Protein backbone atom coordinates (compact mmCIF):
# COMPACT_ATOMS: atom_id res chain seq x y z
CA UNK A 1 0.00 0.00 0.00
CA UNK A 2 2.87 2.40 0.60
CA UNK A 3 3.86 2.09 -3.00
CA UNK A 4 0.33 2.96 -4.20
CA UNK A 5 0.20 5.98 -1.90
CA UNK A 6 3.51 7.23 -3.27
CA UNK A 7 2.29 6.82 -6.84
CA UNK A 8 -0.95 8.65 -6.03
CA UNK A 9 1.02 11.49 -4.45
CA UNK A 10 3.28 11.75 -7.52
CA UNK A 11 0.21 11.78 -9.77
CA UNK A 12 -1.44 14.51 -7.70
CA UNK A 13 1.71 16.65 -7.82
CA UNK A 14 2.08 16.18 -11.57
CA UNK A 15 -1.58 17.03 -12.11
CA UNK A 16 -1.25 20.17 -9.97
CA UNK A 17 1.87 21.22 -11.92
CA UNK A 18 0.06 20.64 -15.20
CA UNK A 19 -2.97 22.66 -14.07
CA UNK A 20 -0.74 25.52 -12.91
CA UNK A 21 1.10 25.49 -16.22
CA UNK A 22 -2.19 25.61 -18.15
CA UNK A 23 -3.46 28.50 -16.01
CA UNK A 24 -0.23 30.43 -16.60
CA UNK A 25 -0.51 29.87 -20.35
CA UNK A 26 -4.12 31.04 -20.37
CA UNK A 27 -3.15 34.15 -18.39
CA UNK A 28 -0.25 34.92 -20.74
CA UNK A 29 -2.48 34.51 -23.79
CA UNK A 30 -5.08 36.78 -22.22
CA UNK A 31 -2.40 39.41 -21.55
CA UNK A 32 -1.11 39.19 -25.13
CA UNK A 33 -4.64 39.55 -26.48
CA UNK A 34 -5.30 42.60 -24.30
CA UNK A 35 -2.00 44.18 -25.38
CA UNK A 36 -2.79 43.53 -29.05
CA UNK A 37 -6.26 45.07 -28.67
CA UNK A 38 -4.79 48.13 -26.95
CA UNK A 39 -2.17 48.55 -29.70
CA UNK A 40 -4.88 48.23 -32.37
CA UNK A 41 -6.92 50.92 -30.61
CA UNK A 42 -3.88 53.22 -30.44
CA UNK A 43 -3.09 52.70 -34.11
CA UNK A 44 -6.71 53.43 -35.07
CA UNK A 45 -6.61 56.74 -33.20
CA UNK A 46 -3.26 57.64 -34.75
CA UNK A 47 -4.62 56.85 -38.24
CA UNK A 48 -7.42 59.32 -37.60
CA UNK A 49 -5.24 62.19 -36.39
CA UNK A 50 -2.01 61.78 -38.41
CA UNK A 51 -1.44 62.10 -42.13
CA UNK A 52 0.10 59.06 -43.85
CA UNK A 53 3.43 60.91 -44.14
CA UNK A 54 3.41 61.76 -40.43
CA UNK A 55 2.64 58.13 -39.53
CA UNK A 56 5.50 57.01 -41.77
CA UNK A 57 7.87 59.47 -40.07
CA UNK A 58 6.88 58.16 -36.64
CA UNK A 59 7.36 54.55 -37.72
CA UNK A 60 10.87 55.31 -39.01
CA UNK A 61 11.74 57.31 -35.92
CA UNK A 62 10.50 54.47 -33.72
CA UNK A 63 13.42 52.35 -34.92
CA UNK A 64 15.97 54.71 -33.37
CA UNK A 65 14.02 56.54 -30.64
CA UNK A 66 11.19 54.29 -29.43
CA UNK A 67 10.92 56.18 -26.13
CA UNK A 68 10.39 59.52 -27.89
CA UNK A 69 7.82 58.06 -30.29
CA UNK A 70 5.88 56.43 -27.47
CA UNK A 71 5.83 59.73 -25.60
CA UNK A 72 4.62 61.64 -28.68
CA UNK A 73 1.97 59.02 -29.47
CA UNK A 74 0.70 59.06 -25.88
CA UNK A 75 0.44 62.85 -25.89
CA UNK A 76 -1.33 62.92 -29.26
CA UNK A 77 -3.79 60.21 -28.20
CA UNK A 78 -4.48 62.05 -24.97
CA UNK A 79 -5.08 65.34 -26.80
CA UNK A 80 -7.35 63.59 -29.30
CA UNK A 81 -9.30 62.04 -26.44
CA UNK A 82 -9.84 65.49 -24.93
CA UNK A 83 -11.00 66.83 -28.31
CA UNK A 84 -8.10 69.27 -28.66
CA UNK A 85 -7.01 67.98 -32.08
CA UNK A 86 -9.44 69.29 -34.68
CA UNK A 87 -7.62 68.37 -37.88
CA UNK A 88 -5.22 65.83 -39.31
CA UNK A 89 -1.63 66.54 -38.25
CA UNK A 90 0.62 66.89 -41.27
CA UNK A 91 4.23 65.78 -41.56
CA UNK A 92 5.47 69.37 -41.16
CA UNK A 93 3.40 69.86 -38.01
CA UNK A 94 4.73 66.60 -36.62
CA UNK A 95 8.29 67.74 -37.40
CA UNK A 96 7.76 70.92 -35.41
CA UNK A 97 6.32 68.94 -32.49
CA UNK A 98 9.31 66.61 -32.54
CA UNK A 99 11.74 69.54 -32.73
CA UNK A 100 10.13 71.20 -29.72
CA UNK A 101 10.34 67.98 -27.74
CA UNK A 102 13.95 67.22 -28.64
CA UNK A 103 15.42 70.72 -28.35
CA UNK A 104 15.18 70.51 -24.56
CA UNK A 105 17.23 67.34 -24.54
CA UNK A 106 20.66 67.65 -22.97
CA UNK A 107 23.48 65.63 -24.40
CA UNK A 108 26.39 64.46 -22.32
CA UNK A 109 29.64 64.36 -24.20
CA UNK A 110 32.71 62.57 -22.99
CA UNK A 111 36.05 63.77 -24.27
CA UNK A 112 39.05 61.50 -24.23
CA UNK A 113 42.39 63.13 -23.74
UniProtKB/Swiss-Prot annotation:
Protein's recorded name: DNA-binding protein PTO0204
InterPro entries for the chain: DNA_bind_arc, PDCD5-like, PDCD5-like_sf
HAMAP family (alphabetical): dsDNA_bind
Sorted UniProt keywords: DNA-binding
Pfam families linked: dsDNA_bind
GO molecular function, a single term: DNA binding
Family label: Belongs to the PDCD5 family.
Keyword Ion transport: no
One Gene Ontology term, aspect cellular component: cytosol
Keyword DNA-binding in annotation: yes
Database matches in SUPFAM superfamilies: Double-stranded DNA-binding domain (SSF46950)
Amino acid sequence: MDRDDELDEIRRRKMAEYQNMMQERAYEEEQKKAAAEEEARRQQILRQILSPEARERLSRLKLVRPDLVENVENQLIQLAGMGRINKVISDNELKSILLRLTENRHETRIERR
